[in-house]
Design a protein with these regions (language model features):
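Peripheral, non-AAA+ core regions of ATP-driven protein-machinery
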Residues: 4-189
Length: 189
């Protein structure tokens, strides 16, 4: 028995569905200098009227404080109702992600789950979400998108000012979370 190098570890951290599924979004994280695609999955329970109990927030593989902040920004800045609803968020394959560049993908996955609308299967999302609902620049956007394109992704949402062009890839720059949701046709109530 021998140990072999895995040339493309992305398959460990993403899953391919026959049809797009609500509540999933792919991002590109950096492990050192190496870009890795990772899928974030979210599940949002149906709202309950007159439920005075605390909503559950269950997080696996993501920073729970960043997740809580992103949920608050979704509610208050992008009008996606998650208060009073249980929210579950996880990374595929047990990957641990703490970098802010995954915020936008998390927000899109949760909004997609809350609305029951799937995101395009060939979309990646990269960007930090600020408390005012702004999408902030992150490092290594060009390297991240080159890897996503190499693995078959044709569309990307990135922060305004990223100034990245890749032939064959539609790259949309967004400055605000509500604008990002509109670009993927998931809007608040």
């Amino acid at each position: 028995m021998c140990i072999r190098d895995r040339l493309d570890p992305t398959g460990l951290f993403t899953s391919r569905h026959a049809e797009p599924v609500p509540g999933t979004c792919v991002t590109v994280t950096l492990e050192g200098r190496r870009p890795l695609l990772a899928e974030i999955q979210a599940l949002v329970s149906a709202g309950r009227e007159n439920d005075y109990g605390n909503a559950r927030r269950v997080v696996s593989g993501l920073d729970s404080a960043r997740t809580s902040m992103t949920l608050a920004v979704l509610e208050l800045r992008a009008n996606v109702r998650v208060g009073g609803r249980d929210v579950y968020a996880a990374t595929v394959g047990g990957m641990k992600m703490t970098e802010p560049a995954a915020d936008l993908a998390l927000a899109l996955a949760v909004a997609s789950a809350a609305k029951g609308l799937a995101l395009p299967a060939d979309l990646v999302a990269i960007g930090e979400v600020g408390l005012a609902g702004e999408i902030r620049k992150v490092s290594g956007v060009n390297r991240r998108l080159q890897e996503a394109y190499r693995l078959g992704f044709k569309r990307a949402l990135v922060p305004t000012g990223s100034d990245t062009k890749i032939d064959g890839m539609e790259i949309v720059e967004v400055s605000r979370l509500d604008a990002a949701l509109k670009r993927v046709k998931i809007t608040g109530e």
